[in-house]
């Protein structure tokens, strides 16, 4: 018999996370590595676990994640978004808790592009009066 699994896709900045929730003990595996090994910062590990805390499902599901693109923060945000979406498939009643915590909203903030004639997106070259 096929094992029950719930799938969610999360995005943040340039990162995309494909998340699989399987009933289990609460183990989180990201790109075939344990969460402690893959995410070096405790604060980002907490960000990833926010949807589980909001729905009080910590320890109920094993989470397998494939994530690519971006850096630590973008990937953590993408995984969080993916877990929240997968939890919606588990139980649609979670929507209220997840939405009030702001976990279902795709964070649309992106890096602003560099403009010609400037050193960065907004940083201008040094101005000399004389």
Curated annotation (Swiss-Prot):
The lineage's top-level taxon is Bacteria
Basic residues bias located where? 111-130
BP terms from Gene Ontology: translation
* Alphabetical list of InterPro entries matching this protein: Ribosomal_Su5_D2-typ_SF, Ribosomal_uS9, Ribosomal_uS9_bac/plastid, Ribosomal_uS9_CS, Ribsml_uS5_D2-typ_fold_subgr
Residue ranges, annotated region (Disordered)? 105-130
The UniProt entry, under Pfam families, shows: Ribosomal_S9
GO cellular component, alphabetical, reads:
cytosolic small ribosomal subunit
Q: Which UniProt keywords apply?
A: Ribonucleoprotein, Ribosomal protein
Q: Name one GO molecular function term.
A: structural constituent of ribosome
Tell me which PANTHER family the record gives.
RIBOSOMAL PROTEIN S9, SMALL RIBOSOMAL SUBUNIT PROTEIN US9M
Similarity-based family: Belongs to the universal ribosomal protein uS9 family.
* Alphabetical list of NCBIfam families matching this protein: PRK00132.1
Q: What is this protein called?
A: Small ribosomal subunit protein uS9
User: Which source organism?
Assistant: Lysinibacillus sphaericus (strain C3-41)
Q: Which gene encodes it?
A: rpsI
């Amino acid at each position: 018999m096929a094992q029950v699994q719930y799938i969610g896709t999360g995005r943040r900045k340039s990162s995309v996370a494909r998340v699989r929730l399987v009933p289990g003990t609460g183990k989180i595996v990201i790109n075939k590595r344990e969460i402690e090994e893959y995410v070096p910062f405790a604060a980002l590990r907490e960000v990833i676990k926010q949807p589980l805390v909001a729905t009080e499902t910590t320890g109920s599901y094993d989470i397998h994640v494939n994530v690519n693109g971006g850096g630590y923060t973008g990937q953590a945000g993408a995984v969080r978004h993916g877990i929240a979406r997968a939890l919606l498939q588990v139980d649609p009643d979670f929507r209220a808790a997840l939405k009030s915590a702001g976990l279902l909203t795709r964070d649309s903030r992106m890096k602003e592009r560099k403009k010609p004639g400037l050193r960065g997106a907004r940083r201008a070259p040094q101005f000399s009066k004389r």
